[in-house]
């Protein structure tokens, strides 16, 4: 199934989905050395964001979060791609300077995709590709 989206940062990537309904502050929620979510109050606590298609409503917090995303990329610990309901400047800048595909303006039911589902983010074509039957719409 192809879902139309809006390109924030170009490129194409695929990987297993990692989904949260909570916003992410890259400064404080994520260890920039390992890519592991270190905030015990976050639902992704203890999970790695490295190599996944990270699906979350959007970012929050300090502008330093953009640089944390860049650090993650330099260390090979960044998400393969990111999908937001609505991107904000911190995540957008982080994705752009790190060359990570980022799209937004997707249906809210994208947050119902199961972790591990293979997702393709083709920001060039402004589509997200999900396997048929991966989510009930």
UniProtKB/Swiss-Prot annotation:
Transmembrane segments: none annotated. The keyword Phosphoprotein does not apply. InterPro entries: PMDh-S-like, PMDh-S-like_dom, PMDh_S. Disulfide bonds: none annotated. Pfam families: AcnX_swivel_put (PF01989). It comes from the Archaea. Pathway: Isoprenoid biosynthesis; isopentenyl diphosphate biosynthesis via mevalonate pathway. Its EC number is 4.2.1.182. Belongs to the AcnX type II small subunit family. Component of a hydro-lyase that catalyzes the dehydration of mevalonate 5-phosphate (MVA5P) to form trans-anhydromevalonate 5-phosphate (tAHMP). Involved in the archaeal mevalonate (MVA) pathway, which provides fundamental precursors for isoprenoid biosynthesis, such as isopentenyl diphosphate (IPP) and dimethylallyl diphosphate (DMAPP). NCBIfam families: PRK03955.1 (NF003046). This is Phosphomevalonate dehydratase small subunit.
